[in-house]
Amino acid sequence: IMKNLKDKIVFITGSAQGLGYSMAEKFAAEGSHIVLADIKAEKVVESAKAIADKYGVETMPVQLDVSSVPAIIEAFAKVKERFGRLDVLVNCAGIQIRCPSKEFPEEKYDKVLDINLKGTFFCCQQAGVLMGEKGGAIVNISSGNSVRPTPGRAPYAISKAGVNALTKVLAAEWGEDVNGKHAIRVNAIAPGFIATDLLLDGLHMGIISEKQIEAVLPYRRMATPEEIADVAVFLASDEARYVTGQVLFADGG
């Protein structure tokens, strides 16, 4: 248990289910109070209640479409009103759309970039304002596709490469507050294949097979959401107090 995360206020986007929900559980297990933000209004309320009941921490469900900057500003204003501060942000909301590049329609391209990159930027912006001089930690979720793209997912790869660059820029901008003592640390995790419902649906649809996944991974299996969440908890904790501007590849090799 990382005691320095107890009673911290942690804002997690895309946390109604999947990887984001696993993140929320891991931080709650450390004693953090969780703001669960997700576009799925009913589901995020259910998830917030489940975590509060299981871990005995405070939770706050927020319906949030991260592609909307006004909605992001409003969500962080609600956090300020409720808690008065923010200690950790995890940008987990994201989508991917498969389509050959020669046929990719503009509206789908915009949707991927708006959620994955614009949403991440403006959530970081508002978190940075709320964290202020007290400092904090931001963990962005990138992807192995940011450096090893696969066919048919060009906008996704572009968006995640942008997340990597954003992570490094913000780490440089926000690393010198009060001689670094109260800096805002900004890091990213670049997972590979994760056994989430989204990927398992792809397996069932025949888009990719487990054998194909195992063939390219030295570890010979997909990650569990909990394994990626453990990395996020580490990066947000004081154990990683000298780690910033890094893109950590948690991809099984």
Where do the model's predicted regions map?
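Active-site helix of classical SDR
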Residues: 124, 159, 167
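Substrate-binding pocket helix/loop in short-chain dehydrogenase/reductase
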Residues: 100-101, 105-113, 209, 213
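A glycine/serine/threonine-rich, flexible loop-to-helix segment
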Residues: 176-181, 193-216
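C-terminal substrate-recognition "lid" of short-chain dehydrogenase/reductases
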Residues: 221-250
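Residue(s) in the substrate-gating loop at a strand-loop-helix junction
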Residues: 143
